Amino acid sequence: MRCFKATIAYDGAYFLGYAKQPNKLGVQDKIESALNALGIKSVVVAAGRTDKGVHANNQVLSFYAQKHWNAAKLFYYLAPKLAPHVVLKKLEEKNFHARFDAQKRAYRYLLTKNLKTPFLAPYIACGDYGSLDALNTALKQFTGKHDFSMFKKEGGATTNPKRAIFNAFAYKTFIIGHECVVFKIIGDAFLRSSVRLIVQACVQYSLEKITLAEIQAQIHNIKATIRTPIMANGLYLHRVYY
């Protein structure tokens, strides 16, 4: 058997998350079904599991296929079976593990105050976010290594809630005619819905609905003020570092 590394992008609006679902509407279901159609029976491992509605620009996968498959041939037959909501960007032979070998993961969150067309609603979150300076002040609180037990949704399977965030900042840019604030958060790994809870905390601070002290209390597992993640549609798994 040969191990393959695949880099994919997908539209999270069409799936119930990355992980396999009973109704077969997970991204993993789509990929494994496409591989099965080619006679390849393999569990597909992803660098990170995204929730329902969350997108990926460069999700990385690892899986095994029979030795008669090479990267060029498999790409040719697999890519059309994944389109249009999953795009196979790159495929190469590589002996590695997509999740365990990943060193860093980068997420981006897109937020605009005024969405001018409904056609972008699944891809850019809409809502007030206050000031850019306040957002960056809040984001700085999260850098470093912390126990993120109070920044995760229930159901995330993990025995170690400690994670390191290497960089977290926000900036403004224009995306398809919309002024957006983009949150960029890079860490070694993330707990379930952790990024969305972090962004929500920063937005609520910027809107003067919570204080920095409340954010710090939640980071240190003293008291949880933010319990509901910000909407999923603005979040993208942007890059995985190896």
Curated annotation (Swiss-Prot):
DNA-binding as a keyword of this entry, yes or no, is no
Give the matching Pfam families. PseudoU_synth_1
**Main EC class of this protein?**
isomerase
Tell me what gene encodes this.
truA
**Protein name as it appears in the record:** tRNA pseudouridine synthase A
Which residues are responsible for catalysis? D51
Q: Which UniProt keywords apply?
A: Isomerase, tRNA processing
Organism the protein comes from: Helicobacter pylori (strain Shi470)
Q: Name one GO molecular function term.
A: tRNA pseudouridine(38-40) synthase activity
- Catalyzes what? uridine(38/39/40) in tRNA = pseudouridine(38/39/40) in tRNA
Give the matching InterPro entries. Answer: PsdUridine_synth_cat_dom_sf (IPR020103), PsdUridine_synth_TruA (IPR001406), PsdUridine_synth_TruA_a/b_dom (IPR020097), PsdUridine_synth_TruA_C (IPR020095), TruA/RsuA/RluB/E/F_N (IPR020094)
**The EC number(s) this enzyme carries:** 5.4.99.12
Binding annotation for substrate: Y107
Q: How the protein assembles, per its UniProt entry? A: Homodimer.
> What does this protein's UniProt record list under function?
Formation of pseudouridine at positions 38, 39 and 40 in the anticodon stem and loop of transfer RNAs.
The record's Gene Ontology biological-process terms are: tRNA pseudouridine synthesis
Describe the family membership recorded for this protein in Swiss-Prot or TrEMBL.
Belongs to the tRNA pseudouridine synthase TruA family.
